[in-house]
């Protein structure tokens, strides 16, 4: 799957001093200079099987706690989405600047941080609802690109990444070509089938390990899939976690 950047606009309402609610979001309002020893990277990957407002709401609800943490501790954020076609990149979450909210007053800082995370969540909502969703596709391409995305951030001038969290929204119920190792068309729900599928992913190097980088799968079993599909997705998550990272859940 070829990565073709598609810059998205940040269209959100007027919190934290933005005068014109119809104007694009000025993401620099939520960014600070990173310390000399660097900052963590939050890499958000969105594998979208639909772009409904309901799905957008679920995605933003699950990602917002990670945005809260990033704004509290100071983190770079990079976001990549795919609905089965080309990759979409957010010009807000590009990974080149550290996001952080700091204030002299603790109560004010917490209030502004929560407000900022809600504003930034609307960028994610916008990306989900505007993403073109193909009838076929899987998370394989996004997982395959993790190391490249991390390296792209690390190679950015004046950016120093000291640890990585990869946040993956996916239902793990991809459909596509037979060559796609995570194509679950016609597959029964069993641990052995999930193990065979994931083993093939790594043997064919469609997916490779990210080593010690932290990986968190969200979105599994949160849609309208039936029980056998939910079981298969859960088994696939377990097998992927066993192979993709030493810190995965």
Where are these regions (language model features)?
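Von Willebrand factor
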Residues: 38-162, 165-167
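VWA/integrin I-like adhesion module and closely mimicked acidic/polar interface patches used
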Residues: 21-22, 173-230, 234
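Post-signal peptide N-terminal segment of mature Sec-exported envelope proteins
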Residues: 19-40, 44
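Catalytic metal-binding/acid-base residues of hydrolase active sites
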Residues: 49, 172-173
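Bacterial signal peptide processing site
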Residues: 11-14
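Hydrophobic beta-strand segments of well-ordered beta-sheets in folded domains
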Residues: 36-44, 73-79, 164-166, 206-221, ...
């Amino acid at each position: 799957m070829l990565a073709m950047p598609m810059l998205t606009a940040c269209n959100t309402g007027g919190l934290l001093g933005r005068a014109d609610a119809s104007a694009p979001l000025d993401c620099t309002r939520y960014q600070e200079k990173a310390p000399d020893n660097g900052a963590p990277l939050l890499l958000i990957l969105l594998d979208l099987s639909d772009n409904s407002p309901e799905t957008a709401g679920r995605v933003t609800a699950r990602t917002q706690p990670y945005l809260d943490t990033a704004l509290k501790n100071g983190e770079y954020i990079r976001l990549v989405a795919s609905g089965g076609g080309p990759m979409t990149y957010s010009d807000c979450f590009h990974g080149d600047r550290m996001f952080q909210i700091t204030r002299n007053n603790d109560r004010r800082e917490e209030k502004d941080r929560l407000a900022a995370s809600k504003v930034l969540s609307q960028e994610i909502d916008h990306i989900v609802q505007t993403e073109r969703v193909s009838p076929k596709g899987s998370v394989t391409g996004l997982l395959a690109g993790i190391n490249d995305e991390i390296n792209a951030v690390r190679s950015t001038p004046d950016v120093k990444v000291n640890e990585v969290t990869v946040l993956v929204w996916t239902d793990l119920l991809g459909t596509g070509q037979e060559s796609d190792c995570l194509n679950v068309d016609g597959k029964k729900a069993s641990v052995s089938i999930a193990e065979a599928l994931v083993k093939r992913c790594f043997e064919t190097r469609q997916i490779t390990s990210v080593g010690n980088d932290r990986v968190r799968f969200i979105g599994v079993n949160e849609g309208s899939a039936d029980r056998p599909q939910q079981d298969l997705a859960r088994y696939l998550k377990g097998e992927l976690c066993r192979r993709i990272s030493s810190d995965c859940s």
